[in-house]
């Protein structure tokens, strides 16, 4: 069972103003946010969670660039998966079964996919998008 400091049910959220990724426990009757990462990422824009490896994946933007990174819930093993030619990634979704990550980039006006290990990156859609943002993966169950 995946846990953050003993918490098994939680909501993850990003705060771009505070440069942080946070969580709220749903295991208790009161809700207080706790910080997972702060200051190590510049303007986080989207988060998703992989329960298979217990990693948080997040997109972020900086001055003139952006990226897709991940880390374990215990704040270790922070790594950047995709950085080159990533500008303003504003949405991401994990394919837990296929071990892929999909993201939108409103700077490059594309939707891309890559493996969760940072390999096999490719563009899915590059024409006809003005400001792609949120993305949801509708995976078949079963």
Predicted regions and their residues:
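Short loop/turn segments immediately following the C-termini of beta-strands
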Residues: 16, 52, 61, 106, ...
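Residue-level detector of Asp-centered blade-edge/turn motifs that repeat once per structural unit
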Residues: 5-7, 50-53, 95-98, 137-141
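Residue position within the beta-strands of beta-propeller blades
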Residues: 13-14, 57-59, 102-103
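Surface loop/turn motifs at the tips and blade-to-blade linkers of beta-strand repeat domains
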Residues: 4, 35-40, 81-85, 124-128
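Short coil turn/linker residues within repeat-based beta-strand modules
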Residues: 18, 28-31, 63, 75-77, ...
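Beta-rich catalytic cores
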Residues: 43, 64, 88, 107, ...
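Structural motif
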Residues: 18-25, 64-70, 109-113
């Amino acid at each position: 069972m995946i846990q953050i400091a003993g918490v098994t049910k939680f909501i993850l959220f990003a705060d771009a103003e505070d440069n942080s990724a946070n969580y709220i426990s749903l295991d208790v009757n009161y809700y207080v946010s706790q910080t997972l990462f702060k200051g190590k990422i510049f303007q986080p824009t989207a988060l998703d969670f992989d329960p298979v490896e217990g990693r948080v994946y997040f997109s972020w933007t900086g001055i003139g660039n952006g990226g897709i990174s991940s880390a374990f819930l215990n704040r270790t093993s922070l790594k950047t998966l995709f950085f080159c030619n990533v500008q303003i990634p504003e949405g991401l979704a994990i394919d837990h079964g296929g071990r892929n990550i999909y993201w939108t980039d409103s700077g490059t006006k594309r939707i891309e996919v890559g493996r969760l290990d940072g390999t096999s990156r490719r563009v899915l859609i590059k024409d006809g998008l003005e400001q792609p943002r949120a993305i949801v993966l509708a995976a078949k169950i079963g």
